[in-house]
């Protein structure tokens, strides 16, 4: 059974570093990690942290109203496909709804676009490149009507 709970920013770093920043010269600590409005979720299986995600209050000019950005979603390789990511996103939707947030958005790696689409996010605009990481799409979900 997988449990989702809030965790601290430093608890996300090992998995971010292993999954998202392996052989990439970019920081695994994000601007905004420690902001008061930011929250981080962890997925635990048998009390082991197997996946992480971070949600930061961040404005994107393509959307209006209150917004959060999803960053640093990562699942340890041996646990990918077990449902941890979906459970974290569903928990985030609940929390963001309680906060009356209008939009959740993210810069999704090409490899993750299908996953995000399955959990209810839509692509917006053309694909774009992030140096050292690769091609991405802006994706979003409307959480609460304005």
Model-derived features with residue positions:
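A short beta-loop-alpha structural element at the N-terminal edge
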Residues: 1-12
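Conserved active-site tyrosine of GNAT-family acetyltransferases
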Residues: 16, 116, 121
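A conserved beta-turn-beta hairpin within the catalytic core of GNAT-like acetyltransferases
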Residues: 58-70, 80, 132-135
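Conserved catalytic-core motifs of GNAT/GCN5-like acyltransferases
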Residues: 107, 122-138
């Amino acid at each position: 059974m997988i449990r989702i709970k809030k965790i601290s920013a430093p608890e996300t770093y090992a998995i971010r570093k292993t999954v998202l920043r392996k052989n990439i010269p970019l920081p695994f600590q994000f601007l905004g990690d420690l902001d008061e409005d930011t929250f981080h979720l962890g997925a635990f299986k048998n009390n082991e942290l197997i996946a992480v995600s971070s949600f930061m209050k961040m404005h994107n000019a393509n959307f209006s109203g209150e917004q959060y950005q999803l960053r640093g979603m990562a699942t340890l390789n041996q646990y990918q496909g077990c449902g941890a990511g979906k459970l974290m996103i569903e928990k985030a939707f609940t929390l963001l709804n309680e906060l009356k947030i209008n939009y959740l958005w993210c810069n999704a790696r090409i490899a993750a676009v299908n996953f995000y689409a399955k959990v209810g996010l839509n692509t917006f605009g053309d694909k774009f490149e992030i140096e050292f990481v690769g091609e991405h799409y802006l994706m979003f979900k409307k959480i609460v009507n304005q």
